């Protein structure tokens, strides 16, 4: 007999030394005794598509086979991987590590078991070994080829360019094209070849280890990274897909994520036959706990997905492997399953404690010609990449950050992201190539816990720019880098922003909410730097003038949303009638030009004020003359200002009459640059006049009459007061008009919300008492009707109207004693009565006062029976069905209660959603006050558990803080809605030891912000208090309110 030829092991093929006995067991533990008996040969397909045969005892548990594979590879972090195979019913399942192999793989000779990544951590820098990252990179390559990792063309080309750099080394066009012709990394690769080659040219000098690092940096930001879809249906029979990730359970429609249930919200997971059940924890103000139900293809499919969910929860959320429960002696009921293996925390601790030897290895593609690979050893590069990633100056913001929760970047529907978005700035790369190419720049957007930051869930249509040179090394930080897919998954090669990652204990939020919260790797401002900082004048007038400058910068950016971004998009799409174009853009462009010059004058004056010792003599320490000159110039633009209300009405009428224009405007609002509702930007010029008036009032109050600047300030104040008085009535009318149209986008099930004479009064969250107990509902109060709605599992994130109570003839009474529910009210209408409960006494009093006022107004009106709001045309309801809809159906309000077929993408972070998550309310009075309280400027930010301060450009508007890396950025990186937050000054026990610091906290979330002067500190406190106290401020009927109502 001839000798059997020895096949190379995976470890030797990769160039690893002989097996050093590395095990996935904790130190001090012994492996279970290997069962004796017949050996069975099992074929394992590795991530590089080669196959290896392993002989294991037939009765051995699955863990023996997985350990054998990991030992063969000398893989220390084997816990992230698993073995999957098709069972006897052709369902792909994971090998159970506790069950005997023979009971799982019935016919080993005919089955190929795949060694693949099972648990995808939120941050690739948590993978300590270069070999582990290499295997993850192979998994990404495989997912791209199989169509699992969907993304836009730019992202795909950038990913493939890093794969090519890892496989063949530095750029050579002929070699690149030859290699791409022989290797297909993605379907329709030919169309991307030029872009791949172009990106590859930017990676010169990048080693394979760095290429893997950058590949994972980009891939982890894509929404479909690590996602395995499991087909299911909701209760209505709508086809959806379920998936599980490190953050919780996700719901997709196609490749679009439409909902997420983070582990913190899930109380219990179970299945019953084909039904998969998620029992959610009850809200703080609701005794009723919701149970979501999904229907899967079979019991086996359902059980398989249930086991995957249990394993993900244990691996990412538990500190140690759960202990086995004793088996019942006589009877057992239902299925039981226990996670076996180390948790992620145990793996991280084991590797950090040095319980292993770092293994050098060679890759499958070893013949590469990278410049730096000739000069550096792989281990040195690896450690340097990690060190640089940990020192990254990328912006981060928050605790419990979560991955983007918007739509996936699927081909054909994603926005095109150009290489080189204007206004962005490069951030430090882990390494720089000899050519000195700049690193791809970035930003952040992401969604958190339901009471965390809200980040715009939208995409960006960037302006076309020439490609910027790039090393391709996106910031390899485990924190928020400067790059963004902003919950849409698309990654641009340069000057684009990517979303933040998750920490191991990160909690996912609803599609609305999202974060930027991580304390590590933030740029720091220490005391030494503070000592070298520029010293500003101490005069309060200087800081008032500086406020004009900082807010003017924001105002110009807001104008550019219309004059630049919206106009350029309109010209490309040709979706707007010429008459509407001529009404909007010619009335905004003169304002932008005028205020650009105005800002230059202010900044020149401030520069002289700051920098000259003889400024007092040369008459530079004043701003009144500049204000007076430019306000007089603004009076010549009054004709354009008068046209803005007409433009707003024309735009909304055009949207109502044209489906194409409606879709176009909705798509534009999903772009990152449009960080507020589009129609809000049309009212910005009117709001800006009030800000000038406030600033001048403060200057006049500050200066004594004898001051040289007093006369100019007083004259400018008189001029601007006259303009505000002329436009005040129009502004009040337009604010209500704009708010009605904004609410219309958040609601489904109504059609004629915007009618002449209807005034918005209050919106907010209340609990409605029904047969199932108290259930959270969203209420909308107008001057003629009260609507109540619920938010379902919809792709659009809108609220469905379930009831309408005309205010005419309504009575309201407190009924705490009758129902035994705190802060309870009974609303008795002529056709229907409902019982509701507020979250607090103050919240109940505000609702009572506003509803009673609205009832009184309705009684005085000449229309005792206002027309009910009609159902929207898409609902296609008959009159009988419409009447039935008024009586709320409990089945209709269940988890998967609405069809997902015809829902359009919708912003999920509006004020309605914030009130829903924070369980509070806001009134039109609050909105009017918020218009007057807008502020911009630099602040230093610190977390409660950190020592360093991070400098951010912060814009406060619309009850929300928007965070930018600098004032030159075109869109915010993240935002923090302030409703529900408390504003205080840190106590001595918090050991801040800095001046001008204020504290924002909500539940467990605490942020410290530091201003540069006493004046700016007081101003930030003033404007933020207007938002944080809006939920608790006693209701006072202002002059504005009386005009509105």
Curated annotation (Swiss-Prot):
Intramolecular interaction between the DH domain and the PH domains can stabilize the protein in an autoinhibited conformation. The gene is FARP1. Induction: Up-regulated in response to cAMP in cultured embryonic chondrocytes. It is found in: Cell membrane; Synapse; Synapse, Synaptosome; Cytoplasm, Cytosol. One of its GO terms (molecular function) is guanyl-nucleotide exchange factor activity. This is FERM, ARHGEF and pleckstrin domain-containing protein 1. Residues 40-320 form the FERM domain. Gene3D superfamilies: 1.20.80.10, Dbl homology (DH) domain, Phosphatidylinositol 3-kinase Catalytic Subunit, Chain A, domain 1, Pleckstrin-homology domain (PH domain)/Phosphotyrosine-binding domain (PTB). Residues 1-37, 361-534, 864-903 are annotated as: Disordered. It comes from the Eukaryota. The modification Phosphoserine is found at residues 20, 23, 340, 373, 389, 403, 418, 427, 433, 510, 514, 833, 872, 878, 889, 896, 899. Residues 759-856, 932-1029 form the PH domain. Changing residue 714 to L: In a breast cancer sample; somatic mutation. The modification Phosphothreonine is found at residues 24, 883. The keyword Cell membrane applies. It is a peripheral membrane protein. InterPro entries: Band_41_domain, DBL_dom_sf, DH_dom, Ez/rad/moesin-like, FA, FARP1/FARP2/FRMD7_FERM_C, FERM/acyl-CoA-bd_prot_sf, FERM_2. Pfam families: FA, FERM_C, FERM_M, FERM_N, PH, RhoGEF. Detected in cAMP-treated chondrocytes, but not in untreated chondrocytes. Detected in fetal brain, heart and spleen, and in adult testis, kidney and lung. Functions as a guanine nucleotide exchange factor for RAC1. May play a role in semaphorin signaling. Plays a role in the assembly and disassembly of dendritic filopodia, the formation of dendritic spines, regulation of dendrite length and ultimately the formation of synapses. Keywords: Cell membrane, Cell projection, Cytoplasm, Developmental protein, Guanine-nucleotide releasing factor, Membrane, Phosphoprotein, Repeat, Synapse, Synaptosome. Residues 540-730 form the DH domain. Interacts with CADM1. Interacts with RAC1. Residues 373-396, 471-489, 496-511 have a biased composition (Polar residues). Its main location: membrane.
């Amino acid at each position: 007999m001839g000798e059997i030829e020895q096949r190379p092991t995976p470890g030797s093929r990769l160039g690893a030394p002989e097996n050093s006995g590395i095990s996935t067991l904790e130190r001090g533990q012994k492996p279970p005794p290997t069962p004796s008996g017949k050996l069975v040969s099992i074929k394992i397909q590795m991530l590089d598509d080669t196959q290896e045969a392993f002989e294991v005892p037939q009765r051995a548990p699955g863990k023996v086979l997985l350990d054998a594979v990991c030992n063969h590879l000398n893989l220390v972090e084997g816990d992230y991987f698993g073995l999957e195979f098709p069972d006897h019913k052709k369902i792909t399942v994971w090998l159970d590590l506790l069950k005997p192999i023979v009971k799982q793989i019935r016919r080993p000779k005919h089955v190929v078991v795949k060694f693949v990544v099972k648990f995808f951590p939120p941050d690739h820098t948590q993978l300590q070994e270069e070999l582990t990252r290499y295997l993850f990179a192979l998994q990404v390559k495989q997912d791209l080829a199989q169509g699992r990792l969907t993304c836009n063309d730019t992202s795909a080309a950038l990913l493939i360019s890093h794969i090519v750099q890892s496989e063949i080394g530095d750029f050579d066009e002929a070699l690149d094209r030859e290699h791409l012709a022989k290797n297909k990394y993605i379907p329709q690769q030919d169309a991307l070849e030029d872009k791949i080659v172009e990106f590859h040219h930017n990676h010169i000098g990048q080693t394979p280890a760095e290429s893997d690092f950058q590949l994972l940096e980009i891939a982890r930001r894509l929404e479909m990274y690590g996602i395995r879809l499991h087909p299911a249906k909701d209760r209505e029979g709508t086809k959806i897909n379920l998936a599980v990730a490190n953050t919780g359970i996700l719901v997709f429609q196609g490749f679009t994520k439409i909902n997420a249930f983070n582990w913190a919200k899930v109380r219990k997971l179970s299945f019953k036959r084909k039904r998969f059940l998620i029992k959610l924890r009850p809200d703080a103000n609701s005794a009723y706990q919701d149970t979501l139900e999904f229907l899967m293809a079979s019991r086996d499919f359902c059980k398989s997905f249930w086991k995957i969910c249990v394993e993900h929860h244990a691996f990412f959320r538990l500190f140690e492997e759960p202990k086995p429960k004793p088996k019942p002696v006589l009877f057992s009921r239902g299925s039981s399953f226990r996670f076996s293996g180390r948790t992620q925390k145990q793996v991280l601790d084991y590797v950090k404690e040095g319980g292993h030897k770092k293994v050098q290895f060679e890759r499958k593609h070893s013949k590469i010609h990278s410049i730096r690979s000739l000069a550096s050893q792989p281990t040195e590069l690896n450690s340097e990449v990690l060190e640089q990633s940990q020192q990254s100056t990328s912006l981060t913001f928050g605790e419990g950050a979560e991955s983007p929760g918007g739509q996936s970047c699927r081909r054909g529907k994603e926005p095109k992201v150009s290489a080189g978005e204007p206004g962005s700035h490069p951030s430090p790369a882990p390494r720089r190539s000899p050519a000195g190419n700049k690193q791809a720049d970035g930003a952040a957007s992401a969604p958190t816990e339901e009471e965390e930051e809200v980040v715009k869930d939208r995409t960006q249509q960037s302006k076309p720019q020439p490609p910027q040179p790039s090393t391709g090394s996106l910031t390899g930080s485990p924190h928020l880098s400067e790059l963004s897919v902003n919950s849409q998954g698309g990654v641009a090669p340069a000057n684009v922003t990517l979303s933040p990652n998750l920490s191991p204990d990160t909690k996912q939020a609803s599609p609305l909410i999202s974060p930027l919260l991580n304390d590590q790797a933030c740029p720091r401002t220490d005391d030494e730097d503070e000592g070298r900082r520029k010293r500003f004048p101490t005069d309060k007038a200087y800081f008032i003038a500086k406020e004009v400058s900082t807010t003017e910068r924001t105002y110009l950016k807001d104008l550019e949303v219309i004059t630049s971004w919206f106009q350029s998009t309109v010209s490309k799409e040709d979706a707007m009638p010429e008459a509407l174009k001529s009404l909007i853009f010619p009335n905004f462009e003169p304002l932008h030009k005028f205020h650009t010059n105005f800002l230059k004058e202010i900044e020149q004056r401030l520069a002289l004020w700051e920098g000259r010792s003889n400024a007092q003599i040369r008459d530079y320490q004043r701003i009144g003359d500049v204000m007076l000159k430019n306000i007089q110039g603004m009076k010549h633009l009054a004709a354009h200002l008068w046209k803005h209300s007409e433009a707003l009405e024309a735009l909304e009428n055009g949207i109502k009459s044209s489906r194409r224009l409606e879709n176009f405007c909705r798509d534009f609002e999903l772009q990152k640059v449009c960080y507020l509702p589009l129609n809000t930007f049309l009212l910005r010029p009117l709001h800006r006049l009030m800000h000038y008036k406030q600033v001048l009032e403060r200057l006049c109050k500050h200066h004594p009459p004898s001051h040289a600047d007093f006369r100019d300030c007083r004259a400018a104040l008189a001029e601007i007061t006259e303009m505000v008085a002329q436009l005040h009535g129009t502004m009040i009318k337009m604010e209500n008009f704009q708010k009605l149209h904004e609410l219309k986008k958040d609601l489904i099930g109504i059609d004629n919300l915007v009618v002449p004479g209807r005034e918005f009064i209050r919106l907010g969250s209340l609990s409605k008492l029904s047969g199932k107990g108290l259930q959270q509902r969203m209420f909308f109060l107008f001057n003629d009707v009260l609507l109540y709605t619920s938010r379902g599992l919809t792709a659009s994130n809108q609220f469905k109207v379930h009831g309408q109570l005309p205010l005419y003839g309504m009575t309201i009474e407190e009924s705490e004693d009758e129902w035994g529910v705190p802060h309870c009210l009974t609303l008795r209408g002529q056709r229907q009565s409902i019982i509701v409960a507020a979250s607090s006494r103050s919240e109940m009093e505000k609702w009572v006062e506003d509803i009673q006022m609205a009832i009184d107004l309705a009684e005085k009106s000449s229309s005792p029976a206002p027309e009910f709001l009609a159902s929207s045309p898409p609902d296609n309801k008959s009159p009988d069905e419409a009447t039935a809809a008024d009586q709320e159906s409990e089945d209709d309000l269940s988890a998967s209660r609405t069809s997902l077929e015809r829902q359009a993408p919708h912003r999920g972070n509006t004020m309605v959603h914030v009130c829903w998550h924070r369980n509070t309310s806001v009134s039109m009075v609050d909105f009017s006050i918020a218009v007057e309280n807008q502020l911009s400027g630099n602040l230093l930010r610190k977390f409660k558990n950190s020592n360093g301060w991070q400098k951010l450009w912060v814009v406060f508007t619309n009850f929300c803080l928007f965070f930018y890396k600098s004032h030159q950025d075109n869109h915010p990186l993240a935002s923090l809605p302030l409703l529900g937050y408390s504003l205080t000054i840190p106590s001595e026990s918090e050991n801040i030891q800095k001046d001008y610091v204020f504290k924002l906290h909500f539940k467990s979330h605490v942020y410290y912000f530091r201003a540069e002067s006493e004046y700016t500190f007081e101003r930030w406190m003033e404007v933020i208090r207007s938002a944080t106290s809006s939920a608790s401020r006693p209701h006072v009927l202002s002059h504005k309110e009386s005009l509105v109502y």
